[in-house]
Amino acid sequence: MSLADSVLAVNNDLPIRTDSPVHSGKVRSVYWLTDADSRRLIQTKGYNVPEDTPLAIMVISDRISAFDCIFHGEGGLKGIPGKGAALNAISNHWFKLFAENGLADSHILDIPHPFVWIVQKARPIKVEAICRQYITGSMWRAYSKGERVFCGITLPEGLEKDQKLPDLLITPSTKGILTGIPGVPAQDDVNISRSDIEANYQAFGFEKVEDIDLYEKLLKDGFKVIAKALADLDQVFVDTKFEFGYVTDKNGNSKLIYMDEVGTPDSSRIWDGAAYRDGKILENSKEGFRQFLLNHFPDPDILLNKDRMPEREALARDNALPLEAMMDVSRTYTGIAEKVTGAAIPLPANPKADIIKILREEYDLIV
């Protein structure tokens, strides 16, 4: 098996029994199970959900996206070795820690394989729940140009790049394109304020206005749990994005849960603590890959300017990145995952065959 064979790049073609179209995201694909299979698994596996809960198989890939494009490497490498397993392992670890700390549940019911989650269907909150402890990235770029108000929060004068902020900031943005909300443009990833959410809480998917307080508490508490655990590893938790949704429990009550992934190198910035104390930034997240791309291509404006999206898509499609750059990203992802979990990240030679075998023999979901 070659290195390219060990990468799971295409994850929407598995022969999983479903009667719905496969949903393919940038990194994960979701296979909604039939009602009969959902009910069977809930009963035979003992999942603690109502018997009529829709279930899905969520399969992560090793693809890497940045600036809203998928990139590839030399030698037919269509993703990053170990990336998918690393992301899932980190999320699994944090979700377990959240439960131990009495925070909310996640959508994950079962983990059949390092690339696979069995999840319950949730009603998503249409908010990218972003939390920032340091001023860097897009916030710093805007601040350095004179902006002081972010998502309704006014920052003080005199902040410096990469400085720790006086308070943990919640700077939400829209998830998907939302229409008909006063003052909120119908575009993806638009910054919004808490007052925007309060005035239109149902349009953002909240069932009760009081749940805005709960989402902020779960966001801050989750951030603090991860930040403390990373600090013990001499890593700095800089900023992150969480996602939330509602599920119905066995008593028929709605409850807010964590969704998607949490505290990963894809959804967060993580800095090496020793380097930060020396005044340097050593990324243990996808931000390092973004910076590589900005330095690698002669016209970085293509990657930053949303008006040049066709050029950006062509850039990603037509340029194979150096193998060493792809392996640098692999080392970043597997390295931070092994630090966080305390365990080696498995790198199966043929992940697709392994997934099919497990889902056939242990779950009877393969057609």
UniProtKB/Swiss-Prot annotation:
User: One GO term of the cellular component aspect?
Assistant: cytoplasm
Q: Which InterPro entries match?
A: SAICAR_synt/ADE2_N, SAICAR_synthase_Vibrio-typ, SAICAR_synthetase_CS
Named in its record, the pathway it takes part in is: Purine metabolism; IMP biosynthesis via de novo pathway; 5-amino-1-(5-phospho-D-ribosyl)imidazole-4-carboxamide from 5-amino-1-(5-phospho-D-ribosyl)imidazole-4-carboxylate: step 1/2
Q: Which GO terms describe its biological process?
A: 'de novo' IMP biosynthetic process
PROSITE patterns assigned:
SAICAR_SYNTHETASE_1 (PS01057)
What reaction gets catalysed by this protein?
5-amino-1-(5-phospho-D-ribosyl)imidazole-4-carboxylate + L-aspartate + ATP = (2S)-2-[5-amino-1-(5-phospho-beta-D-ribosyl)imidazole-4-carboxamido]succinate + ADP + phosphate + 2 H(+)
Keyword Cytoplasm in record: no
List residues traversing the bilayer.
none
Entry EC no(s): 6.3.2.6
Q: Which family does it belong to?
A: Belongs to the SAICAR synthetase family.
UniProt cross-references to HAMAP family, sorted A to Z: SAICAR_synth
User: What is this protein's record name?
Assistant: Phosphoribosylaminoimidazole-succinocarboxamide synthase
Its taxonomic path starts at: Bacteria, Pseudomonadati, Pseudomonadota, Gammaproteobacteria, Alteromonadales
